Amino acid sequence: MNIGKIVQIMGAVVDVEFASEALPEIYSAVKVTVPEQKIDLTLEVAQHLGNNTVRCVAMSSTDGLQRGMAALNTGAPITVPVGPATLGRIFNVLGKAIDNGEEVHTDTSYPIHRPAPAFVDQDPSTVMLETGIKVIDLLAPYSKGGKIGLFGGAGVGKTVLIQELINNIAMEHGGLSVFAGVGERTREGNDLWNEMRESGVIDKMAMVFGQMNEPPGARLRVGLTGLTMAEYFRDVQNQDVLLFIDNIFRFTQAGSEVSALLGRMPSAVGYQPTLATEMGALQERITSTRNGSITSVQAIYVPADDLTDPAPATAFAHLDATTVLNRAISEKGIYPAVDPLDSNSRILSPQIIGEEHYKVARDVQQILQKYKELQDIIAILGMDELSEDEKLVVSRARRIERFLSQPFHVAEVFTGSPGKYVPIKETIRGFKEIVEGKHDNLPEAAFHMVGTIEEAIEKAKALGA
């Protein structure tokens, strides 16, 4: 009764005809299985066209499909395994393990389309999430259940920063992470998987991939698969979960491809008319509840560096903090190469983080801003032309700049220096002392790649010796 037949195939979109009483609902999964041709395809119902026909989006390649083939209405949406068994494994959009390991069997499966938590269940309080990374905690702090945009070009350290966040949350907070690779390079996913295994973090995270070579349906839905796995850890295990999405722009891009194939009229710049709705459906599920939280870090590609493009502009509306990585800073050998003046956070206010933290952060930014303004004069006329006050600002700014760097645990294998997790109190105290001029006598090199201010003092002694 619930078997239909394929009547039309247009690339990644397939029309299937059913008996009138057996029409599948929107978002239902429809399966096409032909063992002798090695076809095992899942479709998701997107539209009802009339005449008992539904239009579906394919989750994998439609190669080998023919009109007249049988399609089974499963009567349920795409469901994926959730729970502790997913940790340390890699999945595709359908929740099938793709790491050549054994099949994952869990007691519980969740549909990938779920409502966002009701307003009464959400936790209205804003609490800072300590990452142990000085530059982030001081100048652009993350909030539990918040959304963070990670901007940066190729090779400035996005992946290493993501790995360190996963490591610190796992080690210091015992928290779990889910990584969703959306429409990015398969090679990068493979590198990440190998690096996670080497750094020993893999047992604290689940990974879901729908990469560049996959059909748009898979790229559009893989973010929801990762989010669904994270929701289980939040709602059932009462965890604070980190959800990494790399790259949120590819989610929108896949939506645009699907929209065109479904015959919808394009909107501004050729994007889908449902752009804001699709983004909202994903982002609204990422939040804090009374049980736990999902904090999401989303890498955002900005097409042609145009921040007004509808795709990044729609993503911005949902963000609580932005972490901007700057190539000029990485060229100075300062890692993490986070731009202290471009990065910002909604929770950088005295009501949330406290008066002392706020004041130190603003003082640090003020000194760095003055230094930035003086750089042209220094480049043309040299340091000697500056007033005594300006020279003091420059010397403190250079110390602050270096003190914003720190050795990472996940980079220990390359650098040879042990990673440092710096508690927020130590971060505030260290920068406060530099701003107040207590360490003007220490050489600049003493502040580079250390954790706390005590380590800088020790390093200065070692340099002096």
Swiss-Prot record:
Compartments where located: Cell membrane
GO MF entries: ATP binding; ATP hydrolysis activity; proton-transporting ATP synthase activity, rotational mechanism
Swiss-Prot/TrEMBL keywords: ATP synthesis, ATP-binding, Cell membrane, CF(1), Hydrogen ion transport, Ion transport, Membrane, Nucleotide-binding, Translocase, Transport
Entry's EC annotation: 7.1.2.2
Principal subcellular localisation of the protein: membrane
Chemical reaction(s) catalysed: ATP + H2O + 4 H(+)(in) = ADP + phosphate + 5 H(+)(out)
Classification via Pfam families: ATP-synt_ab, ATP-synt_ab_N, ATP-synt_VA_C
Protein residues bound to ATP: 152-159
Membrane topology per record: Peripheral membrane protein
GO cellular component, one term: plasma membrane
InterPro entries: AAA+_ATPase, ATP-synt_VA_C, ATP_synth_F1_bsu, ATPase_a/bsu_AS, ATPase_alpha/beta_chains, ATPase_F1/V1/A1_a/bsu_N, ATPase_F1/V1/A1_a/bsu_N_sf, ATPase_F1/V1/A1_a/bsu_nucl-bd
Role according to the record: Produces ATP from ADP in the presence of a proton gradient across the membrane. The catalytic sites are hosted primarily by the beta subunits.
Oligomer status and interactors: F-type ATPases have 2 components, CF(1) - the catalytic core - and CF(0) - the membrane proton channel. CF(1) has five subunits: alpha(3), beta(3), gamma(1), delta(1), epsilon(1). CF(0) has three main subunits: a(1), b(2) and c(9-12). The alpha and beta chains form an alternating ring which encloses part of the gamma chain. CF(1) is attached to CF(0) by a central stalk formed by the gamma and epsilon chains, while a peripheral stalk is formed by the delta and b chains.
Family of the protein in this entry: Belongs to the ATPase alpha/beta chains family.
Matches recorded under NCBIfam families: atpD
Protein name (Swiss-Prot/TrEMBL): ATP synthase subunit beta
Upper classification of the organism: Bacteria, Bacillati, Bacillota, Clostridia, Eubacteriales
Gene that encodes the chain: atpD
